[in-house]
Every structure is written in C-alpha cells, then in structure tokens.
A protein has these predicted regions:
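Aromatic- and glycine-enriched glycan-recognition loops and surfaces
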Residues: 248-250, 276-291, 301-302, 306-315, ...
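Predominantly extracellular beta-rich ligand-binding scaffolds that present long acidic/polar faces
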Residues: 30-40, 448-572
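Extracellular beta-strand solenoid repeats
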Residues: 22, 34, 42, 49, ...
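Right-handed parallel beta-helix
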Residues: 255-266, 291-302, 315-328, 339-354, ...
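Beta-propeller domains
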Residues: 189-196, 204-205, 231-254, 268, ...
Length: 586
C-alpha cells in the first residue's frame, strides 16, 4: 500500500505497473501522477495536494498607503498592521492559493462588482452557428480597452491582471502596458471589449487593494506572495502554493481506469484566454481520449481550474457520488461528443464553482446522461450538455447565474432527440437589468426535445427557445410569484408545442414568438395583472402585440404558489413528484 512516506518516483512506478493501487490515508504533497495503462486507484481518504506547504513569515504590512475610492470602488478601509508572506518566484502572477483547505482570492479593484470602461464595439452578433460577428474584430480591438480618465491613477499595475466581461463569458489577461486611457493586454481577449453592449471590467493583483481579509497579492518582481489573514489565521495556518496544473493526467488515450476515494486539491491551470465555459482550462483530473473510465467517491476542492476535464473522445465515462466544490472553474468539462457509447454523471453534489473564472459551467459535457445531481452557487450556467439521444433528469438546481448573463440552469445548443424530465430549478431572477437568466434554455440548432414534468419556481424566465425547434413541452409547472414571467421562441423556422403546462406569475406574462411558431393545447395560465401578452417577433424585433387568446383548451386558473421545500407539486389533475431529485443515498 502506498503511504505518504513513499517518494514521488515510488508512487509513479506503482501507478505505471497498473492493476489495483491502494493509498493509505494521509496528505501527499507535490501530487502529479501520470496514468498510462489500465489502473484502479483506491484513495481510502488520501488527500492529494498538487502543490507544496507554505512556510509563512509574519511581516509588517508594506502596503499601508491610503488609497481613496474611485468610481465603483469600495470605501477606504483600515489596513492590517501585518501580513503573512512567503517566497513565490515566477514571471506570471499566481491565481490560486489554498488556505485551510479553501481557495483564496486575489486582491481586487473594485472590491466587489465591476467598473465601467469606455470601449464600444457596435457590431451585431449573428449567432455562433452563423459565424459570430457581422464584422470580424481587428487585432487592436481584441488587444485593448479604454478606461475612464483617471481610473488607473495611483494604482500599481506591475503584476496586475484584468477581467473583461463578455455577457456569457469573460477573459482574464495580464496588463502589458497603459498609455493614457488605453490598456493593452498581453494576449488577445475572446471578444472585443464593449461587444454585446457589455462594458464592465475589474482588476486583480493590485497591492493598493490588499485590504480585505482572506485575499492575497503576488509581487512577481520581488517573487513574494502576501496574504491578509482571516481572523484566527496566523503564520502557523496550513496553506499550499500550487505547483501543477493536474494531479492525475493521461497524455495518451486511456481505457479501463478507475479512481475512487481521494480528496484532490491545489492546482494552477495555464494562463490562457479561457473562452466559453472556461473550456481552455485544464482539470485536476486531466484526460485526453478516454473509454471505460470510472470516477467516483471523490472530493475535489480548492483547485484553480476544472475538477475533471477530457479533451478527446469519451466512451462510457461514469462519474458518480463526487463532491466537487469551491473551485476556480467547472466541475466537469468534456469537449468532444461521442454518439456511440454514452457517459453519465450521477449523484454528484456540485457547488461554488467559477470562483476564479465566471464563465465556468457546473457540468459541461457532450453526450452525457445527467441524473440525480445537486448543482448550486454557480457563476454561470449549472448545466450545458450537447450531443444527442441522452437524458437530463431528476437534478436539483438553484442559486445559479450569480455573475454572468445569457445562460441558464440547463442550457444546451446543437443537440438532438433529448429527454429532459423531472428536474427542479429554483430562484433565477433578472439582475442589473439583464433578463437572459433562464431556467430551461434550448439554444441554437437544438431539435426534437421532449421537456416534461419539470418545475421552475421563482424564475422570471422559465423557458427560452432560440434558433431551434421541433420541441414538445409537456406538463411542466413554471411559477414566479415574485413578478412577471417571460418565455419565448425566437429566430427560428421550426415549431414548439406546449401541451398541459402551468404558467403562474405575480405580474404579467409575455410570450414572445414569431407568428405561429408555437402551438398551445390544454395549458393553464395565471397572471396577477390579468395580462397574458403575445409579442409578435421578426428577426429578433417586436413588430406587434396582442393578448394571447384563451380557448376551451387554454384557460385561466387561480394563482399557484409553492414553498421552496415542496417536492410534490399538484395543480388540478397534474401532479409532479420530485421527492427523489438530487443525489441518492447509497
């Protein structure tokens, strides 16, 4: 049995030999193991750390100069008299730090929220499937951002990075130089600043902002990392600096691999533009092409990138009973679809993801069945599944879309013949004027879905259909007692059929669709304002409005409301029993 006293070479040799390899409980630092052949790794509770223990030094705070608030910044704060410091050589600023088993964030301006920049990019987005921008951005537009006059005065930018928000994704890049109001990046961002009408940004790794307990600053010139400790933390507090991108990795195609019973923590992915879903970031478990893989009973926490990522074709990957939480990016990311043998993620608890990269998605995968998971506290979408002929069922999703927009509890594009049933989504409302924060979102080129017996509670926008169609929505319950409700069918030549659904809102209900793009049969509506509006759309624009016509098969009902803890939902003759949503007990 492997134990923490074994050398790295001894552990790697045991894994290289294949077969069953058991680890004794304990903490294994500098964990970075290559997998080359069929192997069954049994953790027995072992904690694998992809980094090294920090030897803290208590130092006087060198950043005590008074920094007044600028627009969008926090008010002045009293600085700590001392900080914890360690050596941290390296040209790139560290983004990850693990203290007491949790990720810590870098010092940030503003302390929360975002600043406004002055860049504009008034070019129409045509849709991903139609090639993106109507005009391709120039190199200069992808490399620069214009800030407000004086916004960066008095700020040390030697080791600074900047997050540029792009509605449904973000770019985190190094600041190369500043000339007047123009910030130049070290690498191009994903979309031009100001695109999609979004003009927000924030700065990271600013010493003048090191005024919040639990944050850190990495001075790349001096090779020092400074940490502002939380109450109760001192130079004896256990902390780790990451050394590796991955803890387990396979560079070549791998098959018949099983990993169970480990805690994995402390990784630092490469500094790249992460793109949609942060898919460019590596995972604590990093695979290429993989088949017959089982990952179960894992606790993946405090890693800087994804929990699990596969970049190649995946056959029969089974992810079950994993707890993936408090991480920089998403829990699961697979990039390549496989229509031959389906994979599955089931009975997992996923939460507090996207801590470093807001565009990260809880579960983002191709051709995966997604069953009995609990996903919450995500910066962007909870689920984003692509492919064909799979099932999304009995998942419990809440507190999602906390930062970005144009996403959903469940969001899919270019998918076919999918069944989504018996899922429960709670609490997605507009934020800062943005309404595209949706419960169930079928996006470009999705076809032939059956969406049945799902519930969305306190969701302003329970259902969005965009450039897709041939879907059946059957016997779902959508409730927003907090205000108005929207659902729609936009920019499509196909149809959506709504049969036996319940829509209940504490305000008006608006159905946006192109003429005759939806059919309605035996649906029940309640609007507290008494208004159920049909906005007639063409090419994404409203060209007329009328009241949605009720008939013998579509009719008004009394208000519908449920407590958050409710799991059996009854409206008239329709009952949806969701007592078994989320992870099951073994």
């Amino acid at each position: 049995m492997i134990n923490p006293n074994n050398t790295y070479e001894e552990i790697q040799a045991a894994i290289d030999a294949g077969g069953t390899v058991e680890f004794a409980p304990g903490i294994y630092e500098h964990a970075h193991y290559r997998i080359t052949k069929p192997v069954h790794l049994v953790g027995n509770g072992a904690v694998l750390v992809g980094g090294k223990r920090i030897q803290w030094e208590r130092v006087e705070n060198p950043f005590t100069q008074d920094q007044g608030p600028k627009e969008g910044q926090a008010e002045k704060k009293q600085c700590s008299e001392y900080l914890l410091c360690c050596n941290a050589p390296g040209e790139q600023p560290l983004r990850s730090l693990v203290v007491n088993g949790e990720l810590r964030k870098r010092c940030r301006l503003p302390e929360s929220g975002y600043c406004k920049h002055e860049s504009v990019f008034p070019v129409r987005w045509m849709g991903t499937s139609l090639g993106g921008w109507e005009r391709k951005p120039t190199d200069e537009e992808l490399m620069t951002l214009r800030v407000a006059e004086g916004a960066l005065d008095g700020i040390t930018l030697d080791s600074a990075e900047i997050t540029v928000v792009h509605s449904w994704s973000d770019s985190l890049v190094r600041i190369d130089k500043v000339e007047g109001q123009i910030v130049t990046f070290d690498i191009p961002v994903e979309f031009p600043a100001g695109g999609f009408g979004v003009n927000t940004y924030c700065l990271w790794n600013i010493p003048e902002a090191l005024k919040v307990p639990g944050t850190f600053y990495h001075d790349t010139k001096a090779g020092k990392l400074y940490y502002y400790p939380l109450p109760g933390e001192d130079e004896h507090t256990v902390a780790y600096l990451p050394e590796y991108e991955n803890i387990f990795y396979a560079e070549e195609p791998i098959s018949d691999m099983e990993i169970e019973g480990f805690t994995l923590m402390c990784t630092e992915p490469s500094h790249v533009v992460v793109r949609f879903g942060a898919f460019k970031l590596s995972g604590a478990i990093e695979l290429g092409e993989a088949s017959n893989v089982k990952l179960h009973d894992l606790d993946i926490t405090a890693v800087g990138g994804h929990g699990i990522r596969a970049t190649g074709k995946v056959n029969n990957m089974q992810v079950s009973y994993c707890h993936i939480h408090g991480i920089g990016a998403g829990a699961l990311r697979t990039n390549v679809r496989n229509e031959e043998v389906k994979s599955e993620i089931t009975d997992c608890h996923i939460h507090h993801v996207g801590l470093y990269y807001p565009s990260a998605i809880g579960i983002s995968a191709g051709d995966f069945h997604v069953r009995h998971n609990e996903v919450h506290d995500t910066s962007y979408s909870a689920l984003c599944i692509s492919g064909s002929d799979f099932v999304i069922e009995k998942n419990h999703i809440y507190n999602t879309m906390l930062i970005l927009n144009d996403g959903a509890a469940s969001h899919s594009g270019n998918t076919h013949r999918v069944t989504m049933r018996n899922n429960l989504v709670y609490g997605i409302q507009p934020k800062d004027g943005h309404r595209l924060r949706i419960a169930y979102y079928l996006d470009e080129l999705t076809r032939d879905w059956v969406v049945e017996h799902n519930v969305a509670l306190e969701c302003n926008f329970p259902n969005h259909n965009h450039m897709c169609g041939d879907h059946l929505y059957k016997e779902n319950i959508f409730v927003n007692s907090k205000g108005s409700m929207f659902f729609d069918m936009l920019n499509t030549k196909w149809m959506c059929n709504y049969v036996g659904n319940v829509f209940s809102a504490g305000g008006d209900i608006t159905v946006r669709m192109e003429e005759d793009a939806m059919t309605f049969e035996n649906n029940r509506f309640h609007s507290a304002d008494g208004v159920i509006r049909h906005s007639i759309m063409k090419n994404g624009e409203i060209i007329g409005e009328k009241l949605l016509e009720m008939s013998d098969s579509n009719h008004h009902i009394e208000a519908v409301s449920f407590e958050r803890e409710t799991r059996v939902f009854t409206v008239g003759e329709l009952t949806i029993d969701l007592r078994d949503v989320g992870p099951r007990h073994r």
